[in-house]
């Protein structure tokens, strides 16, 4: 097959997968996890059921694929925040702020049933480890630069940041998220 034909087929497959994942996520948001069926997903995505089954065997697989994509997008956003700053302090603040706003946004859109289903997956544990490593490395860099306290091990400071900023999921206003980031950063500064 010519390369152009292969590229077109690959693009079409990606579009069908994306439309399917978006349709399933939208249906869960509207109807709840248990009300979503393959028929409803196919109808919402604008494809036939037979086509849908060529891509995904069940709703759970669709939602796991959607969640995996969301996680990858969030991690990439944090990496971009880190890479967009030029000093250890600025990198740390940028990543903490980005993480807080991701938590704020996703926490307001996850119902508890969906979150319980998605967060039992091993991909979530892997993503948490990547997040932990990213933040720990920034804290270690900040400690070496004198902008992060050294009297507490970086792993403990990482846990502090992640737990503190996860509270942003329950905050209503972006200003409150900004204040939470400032308080978290204040706890990271060297004493004295």
Language model region names:
Residues 19, 40, 90-98, 156-160, ...:
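Amphipathic alpha-helical interaction segments
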Residues 65, 72, 76-105, 119:
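Hydrophobic alpha-helical connector segments
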Residues 69-75, 102, 119-155, 159-170, ...:
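Amphipathic alpha-helical packing segments from all-alpha helical-bundle domains
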Residues 1-31, 35-44, 61:
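Basic, helix-initiating cap at the start of DNA-binding domains
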Residues 45-56:
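Short hydrophobic/aromatic patch on the recognition helix
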Residues 111-121:
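Short linear capping/connector segments at secondary-structure termini
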Residues 17-18, 38, 60, 64, ...:
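Short, structured helix-loop boundary elements
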């Amino acid at each position: 097959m010519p390369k152009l034909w292969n590229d077109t087929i690959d693009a079409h497959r990606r579009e069908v997968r994306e439309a399917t994942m978006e349709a399933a996520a939208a249906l869960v948001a509207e109807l709840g996890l248990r009300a979503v069926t393959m028929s409803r997903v196919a109808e919402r995505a604008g494809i036939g059921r037979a086509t849908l089954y060529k891509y995904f065997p069940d709703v759970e697989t669709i939602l796991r694929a959607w969640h995996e994509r969301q996680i990858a997008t969030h991690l990439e956003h944090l990496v971009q925040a880190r890479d967009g700053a030029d000093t250890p302090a600025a990198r740390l603040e940028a990543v903490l702020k980005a993480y807080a706003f991701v938590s704020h946004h996703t926490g307001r859109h996850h119902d508890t049933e969906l979150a319980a289903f998605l967060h039992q997956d091993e991909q979530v544990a892997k993503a948490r480890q990547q997040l932990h490593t990213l933040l720990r490395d920034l804290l270690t860099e900040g400690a070496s630069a004198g902008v992060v306290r050294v009297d507490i091990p970086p792993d403990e400071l990482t846990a502090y940041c992640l737990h503190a900023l996860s509270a942003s999921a329950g905050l209503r206003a972006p200003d409150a998220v900004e204040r939470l980031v400032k308080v978290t950063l204040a706890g990271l500064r060297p004493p004295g």
